Curated annotation (Swiss-Prot):
Residues 74-94 have a biased composition (Pro residues). Residues 100-118, 918-938 have a biased composition (Basic and acidic residues). It comes from Yarrowia lipolytica (strain CLIB 122 / E 150). HAMAP family: Sey1 (MF_03109). Residues 1-839, 885-938 are cytoplasmic. It is found in: Endoplasmic reticulum membrane. It is a multi-pass membrane protein. This is Protein SEY1. Residues 33-45 have a biased composition (Low complexity). Cooperates with the reticulon proteins and tubule-shaping DP1 family proteins to generate and maintain the structure of the tubular endoplasmic reticulum network. Has GTPase activity, which is required for its function in ER organization. Its EC number is 3.6.5.-.
Amino acid sequence: MTSQSHGAPPVPSSRPPASRVPVSGYDSHDSHSVSSSHSSHSPVTTHHHPAPPPPASRPVRESGVAPVTAPEPIAAPEPIAAPEPIPAPEPIAAPVPEGLKSEHKPVEREHKPVERKPVSSPAEKSIPASSPVHKAAPTPAASHAVPTSQKSAKSTPGSYAGIPSLQLIDGNKEFNPDVSSYFKKVHLDRAGLDYHVVAVFGSQSTGKSTLLNALFGTQFDVMNETARQQTTKGIWMARAQLEAPHSANSAHSQDCSDSGVLVMDVEGTDGRERGEDQDFERKSALFALATSEVLIVNIWEHQIGLYQGANMGLLKTVFEVNLNLFATSQNRSLIMFVIRDHIGATPLANLSTTLKTDMGKLWDSINKPEGLEHAKLEDFFDLQFTALPHKLLQPNEFYADVEQLACRFTVPKDPNYVFKPVYHRNVPLDGWSFYAEQVWDQIEQNKDLDLPTQQILVARFRCDEIAAGALDIFLSLLVKIRDQLSGGAVASAVLGGLMGEARKQTVDEYDSQASRYTPSVYSATLEKLEDRVDNDLGKVYQSYLAQLKRESLEQFNAALESSSALTFGENLSRASKAAHAHFIDNAKQVTAAIGQPNSSHFSYDDTLAALEQELDTLRDHKSKVEIDRLISRSAKRFKSSFHEEFDENLNKPDETVWDRILESFETLLNASIKKIDPNYSPSAPSAFSFGFGSPKTSAEGLKQIQQEAWAVFGAELKELSKEEQVLSRLKNKFKESFRYDANGVPIVWRPGDDIDGAFAKSREQALEIMPLLSTAKLSSGKSIEPTVALEDDEDDDDETAFAVILTPKRQASLIEKFKKQAEGLYLEAKRSTIQSTTQIPLYMYGLLLLLGWNEIMAVLRSPVYFMFLLVAAGAAYVIHTLHLWGPLTHMTNTMIAEATDMAKAKLKQVLNEAPTGETREREAPVGSSRDDVELKDL
């Protein structure tokens, strides 16, 4: 796209009148040099641009570029012959008239690394042949397919030449918010991407502003050489007023670019005004490097080879931070070294080699972020080198070389043209203000640029040294404090006083020596020292709190175990309060004595919370143990009482027996609960309380007491369901009617009594209680069921399972067994009547006396026999008087049975030891009758 041309600005008044030296012409094939130069450059090759014939008095100066890995070569468009200009009476600055259109179409570029919408190129405006301007060749933006905004009014340089430059960032590091307004004043508000940014970097008072004014036609303030003081403060910006070469023979007179160039004049480095404060130097240099396409490094020839003089230290810091902050953006920049006051003794090629070597070493020494450890300088920057003679001693040569240098910024066909598409940040100009402000904010927030001054370094060293000495004193005091704490019990106020005194002595020791150094360093080191001291004292403090907690817990346990007239609940509450108060009082004393109540190192809140948690756990455990003890004791007391009531009621079974049993159960249960809580009422069970613990614990305890009571009831029913229990109660009921009369007098059966009728009646009465022994049912017909769920019955779906004692099948089996036992009693009664009829005749007693008279007299006459008779008679009398015949008979029978068993065992042993084959046959006595067998069994 062909850019519109404009008139050349006037030469600044400071420039002495000198004839322009034309730039060497190009051959016809030079129209392709822009593209071919990309591919021909190598990292070590220095390129020279054409220069005017040098005077005899000075050597020819060269300029070189050391581009690094170049981007893919951009195919150059076919050269297009410019159309003949259309005659026009005056240069026109207004928009292109409708009738004036270019006769050729815009050339379509092949290389488009960034996709943008193409914009039709405006028609070329006719210019008078006598006008001293040249036609600009397509800008890099055009060759890179970057659209440019179509300007509504083309301004000549004179239309904004009087506008002063803008202070982009002031000396206080504040970004100017009026940047967009300035762009509008200099007619760049619609430039879009058709603009370029150039910045200058160098030491103070080295002629940076002078170089920019001469090179770009700007009007930056320059130094008053009689005063030699700082002129540029902060970062200033102005629009360049570029001119074409003045020589009519210049081959570039028709190929100059009209792209808007913004020039940033950066405050010089190493100025006496800022002294050791290099913060702004670093940040301004980094800002210039990050936002500009071309960074001009203004350096005197005698500074080359120096480290500080050539700003190598500053460049190292800037490169390192730039790599960390902006490496991901993958932007490239051109660093152009302009060597001032070049006298020619050292060729430019040698100076360039020295600078490239220094830059390479500098790049290798920086700390690179992860993933870029092997990155090279050439991956991010291209280098160019040029030299200028002394401005005051050789003014004509100086301005001639400046004019040649300007071709690199104005003529895209120049082999060393600087505004390559790869350098552009691709930020439209209407958004550049926001972009630059964000870059500045990011630089401002980066701490890597806040490097200390020598004064701060000294302050840091001395403050650290003093703090280390004070810390040694503190550590010696800390050992004594720890020994005293581990030696045994120590008063909290005493321990806190020792800790507070150690802290104060340490801080005073530091303060007495370090307070005269830089306040910020002094305060920062003091803060670190206090944090270290508080951290170490905090460990001792926490150890003491742990000891206090153990003491409080031991005191709690001792108070509970000690005998007291108080109830368990009252004793538990008193012990908890005493343990809590013991910890709080001592913790407050030691904290107050230290004198740091707001420090997080001396807070007992966490330990207090841990103590309260452990006290809660202990209270719950002790309460559970006490509740279990109360429930167990209540259950034992209830079990013994209820067992007696249960048996007593079942001994007199009738239709209301279970009503009486249930009433006894409830009475005993309520009495047992009232032993624990005298205020308990069955109508308000929720009011029950153990006197300690939570209401939930009391409710669960009451339920457990009721469950234990019903479990006892269930155990009694299970005991009742046993076979011997049922048969015993049926048999007792049968005997009560069969053997005793209505007055409870034993019945002596005589011959002729109706034993059969009495037997049938008694058996019937005994069987009548069988239903009562089979189901626990009230007289109303309702079965007895527990009022609380029992653990054994949780999986039982039958609600009446608790009341069932005997199943119908078991009832039938037990009735049959009972009848057999009743029949045995019936036979016994029958035999007693037979024995009463079979008595000894009276004459037998007479015969016994007559026949035994001699034996009787022998006994009476013998003292031994007589004494034996008296003893036997006395023993019989005593046994009879004490009613011991039964026990004696039982004992005798037992002894006989034991003797019989032993005899049988011995006999069996003898038989087992008999020879094999020998058999013994035992036969029943012949002639034994059935009655004899039955009588023997009876």
